[in-house]
Amino acid sequence: MKTILFITALFMSTLLSAQKPVEIPLWPNGAPNTNDLTGDQEDLDGGRVANVINPTITVYRPAKPNGMTILMCPGGGYARLAMNHEGHDMASWFNTQGITYAVLKYRMPNGNREVPLSDAEQAIRMIRQHAKEWGINPNQVGVMGASAGGHLAASLST
């Protein structure tokens, strides 16, 4: 019983000591390409978003970084993004492993397949630029995704 209590306390202290997530704009001076979408981002039920105009990464830094980082690309059929269950909800697990975790909120292609890819490329550049500050190794940045985000991750890796 004491062992279970100790492990639970250790796990909770790791979660609580991780830093608060930070959302960083990918293109503060405007994106280099367009998908011709206008208007405001649509926040849908279940933590989904559509019509992303200003792409970002949300970075979750662990209390004790091991140097590795994962960029997560949520899915949504290239029409919307399942930001919570295919993104933010996994952050605490990665952080308990010492892995810095970043969730990409990317723009939809809307006929221009380069738009989401350029957002993913910029996210990797930004992660590597902050390597020293975040305690990560710029050569240990991985990417993963779910559904359309998996396609984007695979495209980024080629």
Predicted regions and their residues:
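Serine-hydrolase catalytic-loop signature spanning alpha/beta hydrolases and amidase-signature enzymes
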Residues: 77-79, 101, 126
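N-terminal cap/lid segment of alpha/beta-hydrolase-fold proteins
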Residues: 19-65, 113, 117
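Short beta-strand element of the alpha/beta-hydrolase
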Residues: 67-76
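Loop/turn elements at helix/coil->beta-strand transitions in domains of secreted/extracellular proteins
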Residues: 66-68, 97-100, 138-140
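Bacterial Sec-dependent N-terminal signal peptides
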Residues: 1-22
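Short beta-to-alpha linker loops that shape the active-site pocket of alpha/beta-hydrolase fold enzymes
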Residues: 76, 105-109
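Short amphipathic alpha-helix adjacent to the substrate-entry channel of hydrolases
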Residues: 83-102
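Primarily recognizes the serine-hydrolase "nucleophile elbow" in alpha/beta-hydrolase
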Residues: 122-158
